[in-house]
Amino acid sequence: MELVKGNIASPKGFYADGKHAGLKRKRNDIGWIYSEVPANAAAVYTMNQMQAAPIFVTKDSFQSNAKLQAIIVNSGNANACTGNQGMLDALAMRAQTAEKLDIPLDYVAVASTGIIGDMLPMDKINAGIEMLEKQTGNAADFEEAILTTDTFQKQISFQTEIGGRKVTMSGVAKGSGMIHPNMATMLAFITTDAAIPAELLQKLLKIKVDKTFNQITVDGDTSTNDMVVVMANGCAENPMLQEGTADFAKFADMFQAVMEHLAKSIARDGEGATKLIEVQVNGATKTEDARMIAKKIVSSSLVKTAAFGGDGNWGRIICAIGYSGGRFAPDNITIKIGGIEILNHSSQTIFNQQALDAYLEEEHIIIDVDLHIGLESGTAWGCDLSYEYVKINACYRT
């Protein structure tokens, strides 16, 4: 597997673009991904029960088949909690995109992100979709078109050889606030020219989402709009992937790398964030316990504010472990911050405070927890909690 310079349109047969339709003041706010042939597809969605209209429309597209040829996305407006009219507007986005690209209606996925409760300005949406062209575009413009409070574009591309063919996989994501997936306010789109059955792609996506996107948190809020969509159009012409083979393992590793990079990028770009926090939990009896404990630690407001202030207060970490719901032995926990052991057998060690203080000034803080009761592990990612987070969200609509 090789990291390559690319974008969401790098896999063979894909195109992407973004335009300014006027939903936002300056930046691009409507974008699309298009495959020149129908692609096997998979998707996962927010677990928030107040799901936005685009979620229902995309689910409807998947009802008749697991194929997509286009994804239409707008930012600046979530089209959530907008009643029957919001549903009609999302359906209209799908229909207009299908007509413009001359593809079947159910080959189009719809995604929206932005302010909840406002009606879509359909005159602007319609004008934006009319700018669509089948096989032209600038992928960087698409990356910008899906952003809201993000401070940078998030994308990655890898290549590997499968069945004697070069296979490319690219991913792009947005997300900065309201991030606490199962899923959260994040959109992620992954394209690949690999040939893989849709059922296997869906199974793999769920496994990898649980390891990556569902292990990030910024503020504990789960959004109404999140989705991850994967399109595999087979244009690399590799032999159809089969589970349990060496080629499938290579594909799965590449999938993991793409999704982990995007997940960490979202956590790093949390609203107002100055530091990425990574929590690694080892020695658990179950993977689920390790992941649960890691995520509780990285979700703790007290841990997040300590990271912001450069305070190595391990009491906040052990407290989060205690209420995590995961299994552990209270008298046998080891905690390291940046490789510096500060807790052993659940008692404070003698450590170099100056070295710890210096480490906590870095932009990537790693907390290692060993439970010493098993062999399973899990990782979660988040960010610190700064004054800027409050400022951004206190004035979001203004």
Curated annotation (Swiss-Prot):
Primary site of residence: cytoplasm
Sites annotated Involved in the stabilization of negative charge on the oxyanion by the formation of the oxyanion hole: 113-114
One term under GO cellular component: cytoplasm
Pathway entry: Amino-acid biosynthesis; L-arginine biosynthesis; L-ornithine and N-acetyl-L-glutamate from L-glutamate and N(2)-acetyl-L-ornithine (cyclic): step 1/1; Amino-acid biosynthesis; L-arginine biosynthesis; N(2)-acetyl-L-ornithine from L-glutamate: step 1/4
InterPro entries given in the database record: Arg_biosynth_ArgJ, ArgJ-like_dom_sf, ArgJ_beta_C
Residues with site note (Cleavage): 184-185
Keywords assigned by UniProt, alphabetized: Acyltransferase, Amino-acid biosynthesis, Arginine biosynthesis, Autocatalytic cleavage, Cytoplasm, Multifunctional enzyme, Transferase
Binding locations of substrate: 148, 174, 185, 271, 393, 398
Secretion signal, residue range per the UniProt entry: none
Keyword Signal among record annotations: no
Keyword check for Transferase: yes
Compartments, record wording: Cytoplasm
Superkingdom as given in the UniProt entry: Bacteria
Subunit-level organization: Heterotetramer of two alpha and two beta chains.
Function as written in the Swiss-Prot or TrEMBL entry: Catalyzes two activities which are involved in the cyclic version of arginine biosynthesis: the synthesis of N-acetylglutamate from glutamate and acetyl-CoA as the acetyl donor, and of ornithine by transacetylation between N(2)-acetylornithine and glutamate.
NCBIfam families: ArgJ, PRK05388.1
Protein name: Arginine biosynthesis bifunctional protein ArgJ
Native source organism of the sequence: Listeria monocytogenes serotype 4b (strain F2365)
Gene: argJ
